[in-house]
Amino acid sequence: MLTDRVLATKEALVVALGDNWERYRANMKNWFRSRWTKEEFDAESRKILTPDKLHLHNQFLLALLNKIDAFAPLENPPAVQTSSSSGNRSKRRKRSCRTFAERLNFELSDVLDFVAEDNMQIIRPPTTIGIPSDQQQQQLQSQRYCAQELFLPDAGFIMGRFLIGAWEIGLVSVDDNVAEYVAMAVQVLLKDLLSAIIKKRKHYKTSGEGNFYYDVGAPLRDPSLRNTVTRQKVDDTPLELDKELNTANFMRRQNDDVTFLSACEEVQPTERTVITLKDCQLALRDRNLIGSHAVYSINMERLNMMMH
């Protein structure tokens, strides 16, 4: 339903613009690439539209934004309190439901508050020429995108870019499942990249067939030490319990085990260091992480430029 609305308003706008449709689409790309603000895009669009055609621009923009917002998860409204005389049990039930709803509808904090000052210049949005600094600070909330917010793109974010790209190459529309699939693929790719970087730095264990890894950061055991207390013995005979548990020999054996375990522990704690660009470069030497050669070469060039 929303897709049909977008296509209908888009066709009406194309007919109204005529040859200016390419210019309108280029302006929209500048807005989506955060080169322009929404106000700048709206101002440039009004220059190529007559006053009697402005409503088509507003209808198309509203339909497109509704299409993108449809991918956002719905917020559960807080539970409405109703008068009832069922006693304390119903009151406890209402209180628990209200607490659960409040837990879902939490308020997000500003991510930039938790970023070090050294990295603020990297993630700050680009300044707009000709706009005072006070107005730029007011437009900061509307100019922040995935690179500035440090969040992964969601399906709605991807859907808007897909529609512009599809119209640019002559396609009619994009299926809704494509945006969700790409958003999930981005999450899996980022997970694989982070896992590869961490596994290059830390020891880890794998399952029997080597398909799954776990216990990342486990200390590497000294092969010269043989821990007979915690070592698993598969071929051992059944354990024979001592009938006299309160004897001095039993207590002395427990103390010996504690001393032996303390001797097998690490003498120096593991030093924790920050992940650097060199770690990323070493991890990306595995060509199976990024299958596309174009994406791999571009990002490796950027990584090398940041290191030098």
Swiss-Prot record:
Disulfide-linked positions: none
Any single biological process term in GO: regulation of transcription by RNA polymerase II
UniProtKB keywords: Nucleus, Transcription, Transcription regulation
UniProt-listed InterPro entries: Hfi1/Tada1
Gene Ontology terms for molecular function: transcription coactivator activity
Assigned protein family: Belongs to the TADA1 family.
Record function comment: Component of the transcription regulatory complex SAGA, a multiprotein complex that activates transcription by remodeling chromatin and mediating histone acetylation and deubiquitination. The SAGA complex predominantly acetylates histone H3.
Oligomer and partners: Component of the Spt-Ada-Gcn5 acetyltransferase (SAGA) complex consisting of wda/Taf5L, Saf6, Taf9, Taf10b, Taf12, Ada1, Spt3, Spt7, Spt20, Sf3b3, Sf3b5, Nipped-A/Tra1, a histone acetyltransferase (HAT) module made up of Gcn5, Ada2b (Isoform B), Ada3 and Sgf29, and a deubiquitinase (DUB) module made up of not/nonstop, Sgf11 and e(y)2 tethered to SAGA by Atxn7. Not a component of the Ada2a-containing ATAC complex.
Miscellaneous remark of the record: One of a pair of almost identical proteins differing at a single amino acid position expressed from genes (Ada1-1 and Ada1-2) resulting from a gene duplication.
Name the UniProt record assigns to this protein: Transcriptional adapter 1-1
Native organism taxonomy: Eukaryota, Metazoa, Ecdysozoa, Arthropoda, Hexapoda
